[in-house]
Amino acid sequence: MAGITDGPFRRICTSWGAGLTYSEMVSAKGLWYNDKKTADLMKITPEERPCAIQIFGSEPEIMAAAVPKVMEFKPELIDINMGCPAPKIVNNGDGSALMKNPELMGKIVRAVADVSPVPVTVKIRKGWEDTRVNAVE
């Protein structure tokens, strides 16, 4: 949840007993281009752990290349965002727009999982639209 799940929010959650927190979504392409603001989203303090770092993108190679950069921050797991419905995300083919292409979703998950030393999870929606529920594909 961009702009919500920052460090202070995660610390509040863990202080109230949350068993796992998540970073704001991090652009794999931003990491590809070594964007400092993107990298800053991955900073995790000991009080926020266990913490997952959530990445998004639509290119398997760039998503896989993001993993070593993500691992510099030692997350307990990596979450792939394939569920964000925000227009600025889906208009680039990222987030929930990937629900229209289950084959590409599989390639992205495989690319990330193949290089990740920590568990990988995926955030999805039940489908791109109400008339096409394809989450089980």
Per-range role (PLM):
Residues 12-15, 61-98, 102-137:
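Alpha/beta enzyme core
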Residues 1-76:
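Glycine-rich, positively charged N-terminal anion/phosphate-binding segment
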